[in-house]
Amino acid sequence: NVTYDYNTINRTVTININQPGKAFKFPLSIDVYEDFGKNSHNVWVEGAQSSFTFPFSKLPKLINIDAKHVLLAEISDKKTLENYLYQFNNAPHYLDRRLALEEIVKEQKTNKEAYETVIKAFNDPYYEIKVFALENIDLFQKYNKKDAIVKIENLAQNDKNTLVKAAAISVLGKLIDPIYKPLFERGMNNESFAVIGSSLTSLYQIDKSSALNKLNSLTIDTKESLSDAITTIYISENDKTNLPFIAKHVLNGMFLTQNPRTQQLYGEAFKWIAESDNKEAISNLTDDFV
């Protein structure tokens, strides 16, 4: 646990490190950011309680604990949104931006700078941050979404990373706009299963008939590679003729996703299987349990 005591008269900040449970001795890197840049400090933490005092010229914009990201420890550090915004824009490492973005996305509904920072993350050099930003962008808040959509369209069409492209297609699919139908249909011809899956799901949102025709034309092996997307469509269609296929994948949707809507959808399908006399479906479900 990390807390801060600021002395504005002496212009110092004291950083208090509290180790609950067993205490360890370890080196710790601390970066203190002010308007002119950062001061880096390397200290040793010893015992359950340790404190370190550093001077500052102006109140720090950010204090970054474990700045080198080498500790295998959970750090509880109460930062403000302003701290996280500064961290995303100024701290040098991938983890700095990723950890900051995880907090920033929570505030985008009510804070314009937070929303604009999520959009800025679309340009990050790391594809993982791009994907996280796309998966968490909120296009249904009060701020102008036009610029965001233009950037997402560009990623969906041109990004070299297929996971980024797939995530961008999924975002556009949530808009349920027929203008994107050609994009989704082209995505069905991509070599990446991630892109095909997101394109199929997005196409289903705007043209169920076309999506089902595409789905039915797929080979068995391809369907298995697109199991998440296809299982969701089968369940949404209340298609019990494909109960054996659904049974192979229903547990993944129930337990390996954090999406409550998906969990509920797959939970209903589980009931179908449990109440059915479809021996193949029950066998597939049992095999998946083992």
Regions found by a protein language model. Name each.
Residues 1-139, 143-144, 160-161, 165, ...:
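Non-catalytic accessory/interaction domains
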Residues 29, 40, 50-51, 57, ...:
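Generic serine detector
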Residues 31-33, 46-48, 79-81, 87-91, ...:
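Generic preference for flexible, low-structure residues
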Residues 69-73, 95-109, 120, 130-143, ...:
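Structural detector for internal amphipathic alpha-helices that build alpha-solenoid repeat scaffolds
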Residues 77-87, 110-122, 142-157, 177-189, ...:
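Amphipathic alpha-helical scaffolding segments comprising HEAT/armadillo-like alpha-solenoid repeats
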Residues 92-93, 125-126, 160-161, 191-192, ...:
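Short inter-helical turns and helix N-cap capping residues of alpha-solenoid HEAT/ARM repeat scaffolds
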Residues 254-265, 285:
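Non-catalytic carbohydrate-binding regions of carbohydrate-active enzymes
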